[in-house]
Each structure stands twice: as C-alpha cells, then as structure tokens.
Amino acid sequence: MTSRTEAVKAYLLDLQDRICSALETEDGGARFVEDAWVREAGGGGRTRVIGDGKLIEKGGVNFSHVFGSGLPPSASAHRPELAGRGFEALGVSLVIHPHNPHVPTSHANVRFFIAEKEGEEAVWWFGGGFDLTPYYGNEEDCIHWHRVAEQACAPFGADVYPRYKAWCDRYFHIKHRGEPRGIGGLFFDDLNEWGFDTCFAFIRAIGDAYVDAYLPIVQRRKDTPYTAEQREFQEYRRGRYVEFNLVYDRGTLFGLQSGGRTESILMSLPPQVRWGYDWKAAPGSEEARLTEYFLQDRDWLAH
C-alpha cells in the first residue's frame, strides 16, 4: 500500500468504529456483530451488522479494501481508458433501516479508488455521499439533513453543495418508476480535481457529517406511534429501495462484478418488503403527500 492508501484506510476504519458506536448508543438495545472476511482474489473487510434492536430493524456498516488485476465494467464505464488496469478500492458503506416508519432509512458511503498500470502514472479518485429515504415526510427533517450537507461542503466552495445535491437527485432516480428514491443529500464520484489532500479532507468532512445529519432526525421521530397500515406502507416503499439497489446502484454492481462478498454487498436490502400490483395511495393522504410533495426536485434550504 502507498502512504495515501494507508491514510485513507486508517480514516475509514476509525469512521466505521465511530458510526457503529453512535448507532449502538442511539438504539439502546442491539449491538453490531462483526464478520471479518478475506477475499480470495485480494483484500478483505469488516462487515458489521445490527438488527432486531429497539430502533434498528436491520442495518450494516461495512468496511472493505479489495484489489485486483482489472477494473470491472461498472468502475470504468465512464473512463474506458482505465479498463484493464490493476486497482485498489477502499470504502465504508452503510444502510440503516429502522422499525418505525416515521424514522427515515439512511445511507452513506465514502470510497477511494486507485487504478495502476506499469509504466504509467497511477490514477485515483474519491466518491461518496449520503442520502435519506423517508416514508412519512417532515419538512424539519429534510431541511436539517440538507443543512448539515451544505455545512460539510461549505469550506470547499460555495458551488459544491448545489452541484453534489443535484448529482444526488439525478443519481438516486428510479427511472422505471419515474421517481426519486428519497429526498437526496449529496453524491459525487471520480473526484480528484482539488488534489489528494483537499479531496481527502472533503471525504473526511462528508463521512464525519453523517451522524450529525441522521441522529437528530432519529431522536425526533423514534417514539412516534404508528399503525399497522403505516408499517405496511413503509414495506411497500422499501420495495422501491430494493429496485434501485439491484438495478442501478454503482456500488452494488461494482461489488458483484468484481467478485465481491455477496452477503456484504446485499446487506443494504431491508428485511421485510412488500409489492402490490398497481397500488396507489389514497388522494389527500400522508402516503400520497410523500410522492406529491417530498419526493420532488426541491431546494430544501430555500424554505
């Protein structure tokens, strides 16, 4: 490993530890179970899963560091000149699915790729972001989530938050449904334009912001009573989450195409999901308001 890779790895392992600790404390019941694994083709990771807690129905916070002799198609699709290069990929990826339908699902990811070829300069980039998927929308939560995202981006330029917010809205769009997966946040990839030190600082700012963005929302909503019908709606909306992850998500596709660890890759899927044929929310209902108002391309910081 190069000194750059070592620095990124040390940060990611510490980030995984800190996020797991914060989530365990908030749950107050369940604890993460760690599964350390080794990849035959090169590398390994620490999968940490949690479930059946007071707050968290299912969740995972994964660290992986894998390497190989050739980049898979999902990683080189936008940069065909890198096809066939050896690579290292490091990242922390997490998804939290709460029991209570009033608590949104959250997802975050920070990652580092380096692609090498003998006799040529190494090419590296960072990617990541975080996004929120509510089932019952609340403006206060949406504004808070995006405010924390904006504050994390602010030291790196006034254009960074709007640029990566818009990218998130485009990326987490379920094309065959014509709707977004959630209310967005930040998404970026192929980031190397600022030089390594600044890009690495940005990744740390985004990784460190996740807990500040998510836990205040959890604390406000986790004790809200809910009905069996609301739980059913949550499971129906979770189906959209599954559809996006299995059809479009670059991280999922990269993991599967590179011979990654299937259990860790599919950790993001919720434990209980529902599909109903041509199901529609009742007009004027909270359920209808989710798609009509909250799941729209909206500037939440203009409120």
Curated annotation (Swiss-Prot):
Its cofactor is a divalent metal cation. GO terms for cellular component: cytoplasm. It catalyses: coproporphyrinogen III + O2 + 2 H(+) = protoporphyrinogen IX + 2 CO2 + 2 H2O. Involved in the heme biosynthesis. Catalyzes the aerobic oxidative decarboxylation of propionate groups of rings A and B of coproporphyrinogen-III to yield the vinyl groups in protoporphyrinogen-IX. The active site is at 107 (proton donor). GO terms for biological process: protoporphyrinogen IX biosynthetic process. Keywords: Cytoplasm, Heme biosynthesis, Metal-binding, Oxidoreductase, Porphyrin biosynthesis. Pfam families: Coprogen_oxidas. The gene is hemF. Its main location: cytoplasm. Pathway: Porphyrin-containing compound metabolism; protoporphyrin-IX biosynthesis; protoporphyrinogen-IX from coproporphyrinogen-III (O2 route): step 1/1. Its EC number is 1.3.3.3. PROSITE patterns: COPROGEN_OXIDASE. The record marks 176 as: Important for dimerization. It is found in: Cytoplasm. Belongs to the aerobic coproporphyrinogen-III oxidase family. GO terms for molecular function: coproporphyrinogen oxidase activity; metal ion binding; protein homodimerization activity. Residues 241-276 are annotated as: Important for dimerization. Homodimer. Substrate binds at residues 93, 109-111, 259-261. This is Oxygen-dependent coproporphyrinogen-III oxidase. A divalent metal cation binds at residues 97, 107, 146, 176. InterPro entries: Coprogen_oxidase_aer (IPR001260), Coprogen_oxidase_aer_sf (IPR036406), Coprogen_oxidase_CS (IPR018375).
